[in-house]
Regions:
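Compositionally biased terminal segments of proteins
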Residues: 1-188
């Protein structure tokens, strides 16, 4: 995918290591036949809202297996993060990779599970725009103060992509999307 605007943002903000890390992680997972999906801020960039992010979020079927395979080569780029079982770090540039549970929700109270990746690929595959917005609204609605940036991501994606009111958003958060869309439309 690699949106040109997202690429330019990473180059101009000194965060180009994100792409290097994402590519290395998905190649390592593909070598072990593990499918993945990129979510989080990197997916937000690639879907058209060019904002800074500092980590890579990967949805995988089995977090512990993915951590094991990513860190198995002691001379490879990835090392475990002490005390955090779902995160590795790229020793070349310090970028963290957070591994997210396919088919499960992030935390208690959330209602939108992460999508199930099916394709094994050596190149990054991203969650769909609809999935991304659904996940962002779910995160925000369960922690509205601390996860305000997730709501902002949705607002900015609606504006940047000129999204329609009727979008295939997950049922538990569809009303949040419609309310946000309506509020933006009312401000025009």
């Amino acid at each position: 995918m690699w949106d040109p605007g997202a690429y330019e943002l990473r180059e101009n903000t000194g965060t180009s290591g994100l792409e290097q890390t994402a590519r290395a992680a998905v190649r390592a997972l593909a070598d072990r036949d593990i499918p993945h999906l990129v979510a989080g801020g990197l997916a937000v960039q690639e879907h058209g809202y060019h904002r800074v992010t500092l980590d890579v979020d990967l949805v995988v079927p089995d977090i512990l297996e993915a951590v094991e395979f990513l860190t198995a080569d002691l001379s490879g780029p990835f090392v475990r993060v002490a005390g955090v079982e779902d995160r590795v770090q790229d020793r070349r540039n310090g970028v963290f990779v957070d591994l997210l549970p396919a088919g499960k929700v992030l935390r208690r109270g959330c209602q939108v599970p992460f999508p199930e990746p099916v394709e094994v690929s050596e190149t990054p595959k991203f969650v769909s725009l609809e999935q991304l917005i659904s996940l962002k609204l779910d995160s925000w609605s369960n922690n509205p103060v601390r996860r305000l940036k997730d709501k902002v991501d949705v607002i900015e994606l609606i504006q940047a992509r000129h999204l329609p009111r009727e979008l295939n958003i997950a049922a538990p958060v569809r009303q949040h999307y419609v309310e946000t869309w309506d509020a933006l439309e009312a401000e025009h």
